[in-house]
Amino acid sequence: MSSKKVQSPKEESIAKMLICKVHIGTKNLENKMKRYVYTRAKDGVHILNLAKTYEKLQLAARIIVAINNPADVVVVSARPFGSRAVLKFAQYTGAQAIAGRWTPGMLTNQIIQKFTEPRLLIVTDPRTDAQPVKESAYANIPVIALCDSDSPLEHVDIAIPCNNKGKESIALMYWLLAQEVLYLKGTLPRSKPWKVMVDMFLWRDPEQFELKNLAIEETAPAAPHLAENQFATEAPYEEWNKKEEWNDNANEEWKNPIAADEW
């Protein structure tokens, strides 16, 4: 009998990263990201080292767990592919999610209504989320960022090397980070797998849903046509042409009053 090899959590996570193309970088390379690059492909695309990705993921999860109040962690994504991922991450970890446009001054301007003072900031891309990263430097807030091979590391404290442009990669990274946070908090035992699928963190195009619903409506069978006689509830034509009126009997009663001795 051939015994099946049981993968370690690290091997299992790296296998999922390979499937979701977390290791695929870009053709451009930032100087400070060289330490995270494993090799360069023939087409010029840089391949990231997934072993270092896993290590930085573990470190980021420990930093998140060290914060007593989960609401003091703010997760940001201006990139559409990361909007659903940050919302789901906030749902399962208790953090605050800001998906979409960042309002300038949220970390520095105390006058605005959306002003917040988090203890930790997590961004999906330090290039597209440059405004919150810059404000965190003024407010002395540590930053954890998903960094590609061309991502600037200025004001970034913990860089997790990964593909931060693909929707599958972003969904998996936030799923792994949320899973590790739940493991470290003791909410989820390591002996049992997390029942939440990675698909829950995956971004979905609303236009595709509309097209899918239209296709379902077109392929659906039409409603059965009912005959006209099934709705014939009106009285026959002859009844409407009768010369009698409903008050004829009443007129005769008034003409012939009842005798007094009949009362």
Curated annotation (Swiss-Prot):
Q: What is its main location?
A: cytoplasm
Q: Name one Pfam family in it.
A: Ribosomal_S2
Classification via PANTHER family = 40S RIBOSOMAL PROTEIN SA (PTHR11489)
Described by its record, this protein's role is as follows: Required for the assembly and/or stability of the 40S ribosomal subunit. Required for the processing of the 20S rRNA-precursor to mature 18S rRNA in a late step of the maturation of 40S ribosomal subunits.
User: Where located?
Assistant: Cytoplasm
Gene Ontology cellular-component terms listed? cytosolic small ribosomal subunit
Q: Which organism is it from?
A: Plasmodium vivax (strain Salvador I)
Q: How does it assemble?
A: Component of the small ribosomal subunit. Mature ribosomes consist of a small (40S) and a large (60S) subunit. The 40S subunit contains about 33 different proteins and 1 molecule of RNA (18S). The 60S subunit contains about 49 different proteins and 3 molecules of RNA (25S, 5.8S and 5S). Interacts with ribosomal protein S21.
> What keywords are annotated for this sequence in UniProt?
Cytoplasm, Ribonucleoprotein, Ribosomal protein
Similarity field: Belongs to the universal ribosomal protein uS2 family.
Tell me the domain of life.
Answer: Eukaryota
Q: Which GO terms describe its biological process?
A: ribosomal small subunit assembly; translation
The identity of this protein, by name, is Small ribosomal subunit protein uS2
Keyword Ribosomal protein set for record = yes
MF-aspect GO terms: structural constituent of ribosome
